Amino acid sequence: PTLYERALEEAETFLKPGPQDRLVDLYCGTGTTLRRWLDSGARVMGVELAGEAVECARLNASEAVLLRGKCVERIPQLTAWLNEGGDWAGRRLLYVNPPRTGLEPEILAWTTDVARPERIAYLSCSAGTLSRNLAVLTESGYGVERITPYDFFPGTRHVETLVSLRRLGTV
């Protein structure tokens, strides 16, 4: 497998999505990750801004609920989807692969105060924004379980980092 596939395998092993779970995938790109979560049986919602990527995601993961636009503009729909049907036996899970700017403050607040996923897999391409985002998440009740660097671009100074976080007090 490629390094990217290994990173996704690690994320999936940590998240352990299943048929009872709802998984939100922010900055979902062309749907590669959506397909993976769907194949695990989870209910999946993705958000992506880029139009061509959204069209590819619709082809790659047609069963997923897919929203086009900025993640911050889709907070109402994300919240409604997570809450639809009232109580259910499954978990809330979050996978994010944001741009170099990291997670927007509104997305961080939504994550920690509204969505409150049991587990987060965060794939980052910027150590600086990752550090700032992790400070907020850990101050808000999340513990870092594992940090794995991936050299997707050998010969450059760019390193992708996968961080596995668990909400404190959850299994």
Question: Where on the chain are the PLM-derived regions?
Answer:
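Rossmann-like S-adenosyl-L-methionine
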Residues: 1-171
